[in-house]
Amino acid sequence: MTLSFITRWRDELPATYTALSPTPLNNARLIWHNTELANTLSIPSSLFKNGAGVWGGETLLPGMSPLAQVYSGHQFGVWAGQLGDGRGILLGEQLLADGTTMDWHLKGAGLTPYSRMGDGRAVLRSTIRESLASEAMHYLGIPTTRALSIVTSDSPVYRETVEPGAMLMRVAPSHLRFGHFEHFYYRREPEKVRQLADFAIRHYWSHLEDDEDKYRLWFNDVVARTASLIAQWQTVGFAHGVMNTDNMSLLGLTLDYGPFGFLDDYEPGFICNHSDHQGRYSFDNQPAVALWNLQRLAQTLSPFVAVDALNEALDSYQQVLLTHYGQRMRQKLGFMTEQKEDNALLNELFSLMARERSDYTRTFRMLSLTEQHSAASPLRDEFIDRAAFDDWFARYRRRLQQDEVSDIERQQLMQSVNPALVLRNWLAQRAIEAAEKGDMTELHRLHEALRNPFSDRADDYVSRPPDWGKRLEVSCSS
């Protein structure tokens, strides 16, 4: 089957990119590809059998027209000016049979005009982390970019140490970022901001295109998508680590996996990025940061959208966030109805978990085994203060009884939303260290495991992290 690529970005937004081709690596070789995703995109298996090829930037497929996008942004709350694709190249936009499109973005593809002081490269460590994280999030049901392939090489890349150069093929319906809009707003080119908005509406909100109120309705949905995404992050214990405006997806996708981390111990102020000295991007601050980022996006739209309409949309953020968060947390607790004491029960559990440094994922998974008429629970052994747990657990079971739902029905719901497996940093690190020695077995094994996060397992993928794996510091270097 021949793949079809179109050039909407190149043709409709000429001021937003520089056309250029990838720079191949030395002795590049394909070490992993996403068979399930490739099948979904109707990619012939033969493309994965002819060396690095398109996956290593050595060839282009018919119809591809590679380019690097320019955008700007606020980083750690400070205006950073022009940024752009410093090491990534949009190879093309694949047109799928259902009329939707998928960007093919090659990360680590070499120098671009937007590389600033960088070398345009990515290292094996970061490409493995992003591939694992994006696929883990996808199978958790959280909107995200996807990983299609990884190529490693003999090209040395200099970070804190010398590491192997690598490339990741990332795919997504769109790579539109808040930072695209900021770029032209701060260049005082509001007509180009409007062009970006029109492009987004035409191709991703086409049902609004003929509505006279299209910009307001569109921004309302951007706010809602962002609020929903953040609610989902918070419920699975995901910390992004670097929520700069240039890393915010207009479509509400999880974008740009850098120093991310899933909670091990329940620690609301968890900071996964060792460069985040002030804790701006701590786990519990993510909802506030996302709103701040939406305010920056709203500012760029103010030349052609009424300020009252923008503020009304921003004011809806908290309610949308809390609604989605509340729904998901009630599911995690097994509540089939909404009762006034639910928030108090959840907050008391969180307080107990924080005091005891309980494992976030394991706590909710073990809670899924609760029998409403039995005081016995494997979760009890996870707490030092047994009396405090017993008191909370008794009230929790009384709340479950109010719903008049069988244990089996409720347990099935809870086990479908409380994962047994999340991508803990130590699991990723173990796969990385093996891959850097040439052994890809653990990379493939972990990828396969992450496809079934809600299934019980008997291996160490679902265990507490070992001592060396707790609070691994992760940097932005990639």
From Swiss-Prot:
EC number per UniProt: 2.7.7.-, 2.7.7.108
Xref: InterPro entries: adnlytase_SelO, SelO
Active site, per annotation: 246
Cofactor: Mg(2+); Mn(2+)
GO molecular function: AMPylase activity; ATP binding; magnesium ion binding
Top EC class of this enzyme: transferase
Catalytic activity: L-seryl-[protein] + ATP = 3-O-(5'-adenylyl)-L-seryl-[protein] + diphosphate; L-threonyl-[protein] + ATP = 3-O-(5'-adenylyl)-L-threonyl-[protein] + diphosphate; L-tyrosyl-[protein] + ATP = O-(5'-adenylyl)-L-tyrosyl-[protein] + diphosphate; L-histidyl-[protein] + UTP = N(tele)-(5'-uridylyl)-L-histidyl-[protein] + diphosphate
Keyword entries, A-Z: ATP-binding, Magnesium, Manganese, Metal-binding, Nucleotide-binding, Nucleotidyltransferase, Transferase
Keyword Cytoplasm on entry: no
One Pfam family of this chain: SelO
Stated family: Belongs to the SELO family.
Role description: Nucleotidyltransferase involved in the post-translational modification of proteins. It can catalyze the addition of adenosine monophosphate (AMP) or uridine monophosphate (UMP) to a protein, resulting in modifications known as AMPylation and UMPylation.
Protein name: Protein nucleotidyltransferase YdiU
Organism expressing this protein natively: Escherichia coli (strain 55989 / EAEC)
Gene behind the chain: ydiU
